[in-house]
Amino acid sequence: MTGLDDLVGEEYGPVPIEPTPDRVAEFVVATGDDPDRWASVVPPSFANASLFAVAPRFLEDPRVVPFTRSLIHSEQRFEWTRPALVGATIDVVGRVGAARQRAGLNLVSFEVSASSDGVPWLSGSAQFLLSTEAAAAAAEEKEPPASERPPHDPPGGSLPLPGVGEALEPMRVGASRLDLVRYAAASGDWNPIHRDHWSAVAAGLPGTIVHGLLMTAWMGQLAARYSTANLPLQSLTVRFRKALRPAVPAAVTGTVAERAETGTDLDLVLDAGSERLITGTARVTP
């Protein structure tokens, strides 16, 4: 079986999304964000819903399905060019930007672009690792009670930006299994490994896991507290290192890497105890 090279340049979409007030409010609640801040402007993390408007079309493509016995979302990048208004139609296009094989894995760069009322709003890329072989089994763990949630801090109001090298205010995060179902409904990411124990075990996981892009949303929320702009984030890039189980407490922390007139760069991490789960960088609008 050959790789996925022949799909480079293939497009999926455009797919329209209607960010109605109710849908945006549902998404804000599902990600634990600030409803007052996002009453008229779509939150940056709504990029997650844009990606999953088109990514399933790629992953369910009959030419791709044989390669999805093992699927890892290893990296994600988003860049925003302007605010998107609640109620303004968002059109999303996905594209296979690159594909190569290495050590039995297919490395695919899946690009996404979105416009709001015809004007560019978002661009980004997801790095997927796909294989025709099933993932190695992990030690199975018992699922926590569906409603068990660790401490989770609301984003709160804006904060003064620290100096270069100084720490951001930590934010405790985590999700219950019910939270994961709510997020799946709000984002369109219905991958069963986030809600069905046996699907997760079959994928080589100990049990259900928190959506990677939900954790990315939490990281973006911390960064966005350091900007009062309607477009608080100019970019966010993350690398997924380990999974987070529901009901496990975690925290987003960060430091100021560089300050400039055009934007402030932040280094971000999401840890669960001593385990580093995600590393990332964000550029915040002054």
Locations of the language-model features?
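Hot-dog-fold acyl-thioester-processing enzymes
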Residues: 1-75, 135-232
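HotDog/MaoC-like acyl-thioester-processing domains
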Residues: 1-7, 75, 80-169, 243-286
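Intrinsically disordered, low-complexity sequence elements enriched in Ser/Thr/Gly/Pro
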Residues: 175, 193, 237-239, 274
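A conserved acidic, glycine/proline-rich C-terminal tail/linker
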Residues: 226, 230-242, 251
